Each structure stands twice: as structure tokens, then as C-alpha cells.
Amino acid sequence: MSNYVNDMWPGSPQEKDSPSTSRSGGSSRLSSRSRSRSFSRSSRSHSRVSSRFSSRSRRSKSRSRSRRRHQRKYRRYSRSYSRSRSRSRSRRYRERRYGFTRRYYRSPSRYRSRSRSRSRSRGRSYCGRAYAIARGQRYYGFGRTVYPEEHSRWRDRSRTRSRSRTPFRLSEKDRMELLEIAKTNAAKALGTTNIDLPASLRTVPSAKETSRGIGVSSNGAKPELSEKVTEDGTRNPNEKPTQQRSIAFSSNNSVAKPIQKSAKAATEEASSRSPKIDQKKSPYGLWIPI
């Protein structure tokens, strides 16, 4: 009973200890609440930061896509894509270093169709090609590979070693010498001394030589023209072609024979110079009735 009274008495130790226990429980609750609030705040801040980063990445991606589209359109529809800002610095350096002028940057029409379909600009490739040619190297294809040139151009490999652009031509004297050498070689190979040359290889005397030969005649008169072949095997160029003779046909003889005109008829025809029947009109010449 005394214990019961002591417990219920206002000054008992149980009543003194009860508020301390309530205070400890409240503090634990407050700490848990503060922890949950701080965790929620940190999660919110983390989500905000992640959303910011994601929005920034999306914006950057959209900007890069728009730039790519713009560049593609610019490459398709513009001819001055090679003069972009990204490569202006390298060109300025090349101008200072190698002394290029602006005519190397303008590519000809044959390279423009290729460069539009490729990602590389035409100005850089053409500039590299011009620089390689200037240094004596050969530029292969549309890429950047440059190989040293093994042989020089065909113009530099001429017999006379001249750098002129005109092709090499032989003079008449050189041709005659080569023809004589070929004759001797053919005679040795065939074992014959006299070789009949074709008409294309026979030499025709020039007009000066023929005029000199006519002027230095012993009698002072021009030599008579004949159908004899010269020593080289060609006819004399000064001789005139003979007149076409008329042909007579007969039923007894099937072989056509030319008609022999009398001297009187020949003189009359030569004096008049206008025959009664025009031979040029008829394709078969003069026809004589039998």
C-alpha cells in the first residue's frame, strides 16, 4: 500500500522521469522529419540539375542538327562553300608561306560537278593540286594523296630537248637522210642493190630545181615534153596530159580502137578551138555513125 501511495504521490520519481522520456521521443521525431526534408530537398535539387543538363543537351543537339541542315543546304545550293570561315585561316597561311594568288582557288568547271557531291570543298583540293604540280609531283584522284612524278611531260622528252610546245618536225634534208639509211638497210636485209620504191616514197623535184634545169639548157630553148619516166620513177610534173581520143565501135570487131584523125582535121580543130560537138556534155565522148 505504501508503494502504491508513493507511486501516486505528486513528488514521486516516476512523475519526474516522464517528461524526459517524452522530450527524447519528440527530438527523435524532429530529427527524422528534418532528415526526410533534407533528403527531399537534395533529391529535388538533383532532379533540377539533371533536368537542366538534359535541357541543355537537348538544346545543343537541336542546334547542331539545325547547323548540319543549314550546312547541307548551303553545300547544295551555294557555289561559294569553299570560302568558309573555318578554312580561311589555313588559306591565309598558305598565301603567306607559298605565295599563292587567288586564281588557284577558283577551280575550273570540270571540278565543280565532282566537288558538289563530295563533303570536301573544291578549293582546298584544287589548291593542293596546283601546289603539287608546281613542285613537280603528280596529284592522283580527288583525295589528298600526292606521289612524286617519275617521268616528265612528253614535251620535255623531245629529241632536241627543247621546251617549246610545238611538236617535233623533221626537215626535208633529214627525211632524205633517213630514207637513204632505210634503203641501205633494206638492201642488206634482202641482198639486192636495186629496190623499187612505192609512189608515196618517191621524191618529186621541187619547182625551183625544174626551173633552173629548164633555164640552163644548152640550146636556149625549152625541152620537149614527153611521157618518159624520170630517173626516180615518177613522171615529169611539167608535162601536160594528152587529149582524150575518141573511140569507134563496129559490129565486126568487138575491140574498141581509137580513131586516127588526119592532119587537116587536127589543124582545123586547133585553129577554131570550138568543135561542132561539145565533148564535155556527153559522158562517153564523141560518137561517130557507122
Swiss-Prot record:
One of its GO terms (cellular component) is nucleus. Expressed in brain (at protein level). GO terms for biological process: spliceosomal complex assembly. Belongs to the RSRP family. It comes from the Eukaryota. Probably acts as a spliceosomal factor that contributes to spliceosome assembly and regulates the isoform switching of proteins such as PARP6. The keyword Phosphoprotein applies. This is Arginine/serine-rich protein 1. Residues 1-125, 150-169, 204-290 are annotated as: Disordered. Residues 150-159, 224-238, 266-281 have a biased composition (Basic and acidic residues). The modification Omega-N-methylarginine is found at residue 135. Phosphorylated. Phosphorylation at Ser-107 and Ser-109 mediates the interaction with spliceosome proteins. The lineage of its organism: Eukaryota, Metazoa, Chordata, Craniata, Vertebrata. Pfam families: RSRP. The modification Phosphoserine is found at residues 12, 107, 109, 274. It is found in: Nucleus. InterPro entries: RSRP1 (IPR029656). Residues 19-31 have a biased composition (Low complexity). Changing residue 109 to A: No effect on interaction with spliceosome factors. Signal peptide: none annotated. Residues 32-123 have a biased composition (Basic residues). Residues 239-255 have a biased composition (Polar residues). Keywords: Methylation, Nucleus, Phosphoprotein.
